[in-house]
Structure formats: structure tokens, C-alpha cells
Amino acid sequence: IMLHAYMLTQSGIPMLYSGDELGQVNDYSYKNDPEKCADSRYIHRGKLPWELAEDKEDVTTVQGKIFQTLDRLEKIRRQEITFDKDADVYTYDVHDDSILCVLREYKGRRFFGIFNFSNQEKTAWMQEKGMYRNLLTGEKAELKDISLSGYEFHWYGN
């Protein structure tokens, strides 16, 4: 989910392959077809196992967690002005090479996407003034020394 959140943080039109929204894994069967084996694009073109879609509403399942989180992220992206195509986009130094922080600014509003690309708990060292809202949970927070679990991300806006 963290990689999809990162992709949705970027400008432009995000792309999901069919099945990504349900956690479908790569299909390597194309390597057994002489006409397709040299074209790695087929890794994403396997048949969709429709039984995965049956659990998309149940957040206790992998499929449900992925589907519901992506749905929420897409809604936030549509609602937040900082995702405008004309927003200024920067990286923000948090003093740890395994954490990427993306800052988007537009019309006086700010968005921070903070992504831990490590499997270990890390701290994003930040000292932002003012309160920000966690766009996923609605909780208010100061952006000071944000702790992230392995592969965790946060989206904050003002």
C-alpha cells in the first residue's frame, strides 16, 4: 500500500494494473509461452481471480485492506487542493535516507507525504510549525519527529 500511496502523491495520472487494487500477485506463467516469454509486460496481464474481489469490503482481509485504503487515498487526492496539477512539489529532508518526504504546496496549503522505505521503525526528523491533519485518520498533529513503522506512510495536510 505504501508504494501506491507514494505513486498517488506524485503529479499526473496514477496507474494501477488490473488486480493491484485487490493485491493480485504477479503472474509468471507468461514465461512458459514462447510468444510472450520475452515480453515482461505480461507479468501484469494474468487472469484476475475474481474470488479476490469477494473480500474487497472486508478490511480484515488483505484484499479488503488494500481496496479500502486505495479507495480512501483516491478520494483524498480528489478532495485536497494540494494535488492540483499546478502544485509545487519538493522533497523535504528528514535526515534519514530510508525515508522520503514529499512536500506539495498550492495556494497557501501544504501537504506532506512521508514514506518509510525500510522494514524497520524510523523517525522522520521534522520541525514544522503549526498543526497538520493526518488525512487518513483525521487526527491533528505537529510535524515534529514523526515515527513510522517499517513500510509505513503518512499523509498530512494543513
Role assignments for model-derived ranges:
Residues G113-F115, M126, A141-S147:
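Short amphipathic beta-strand/extended segments with alternating polar/hydrophobic composition
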Residues Q127-E139:
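Solvent-exposed beta-hairpin/edge-strand motifs
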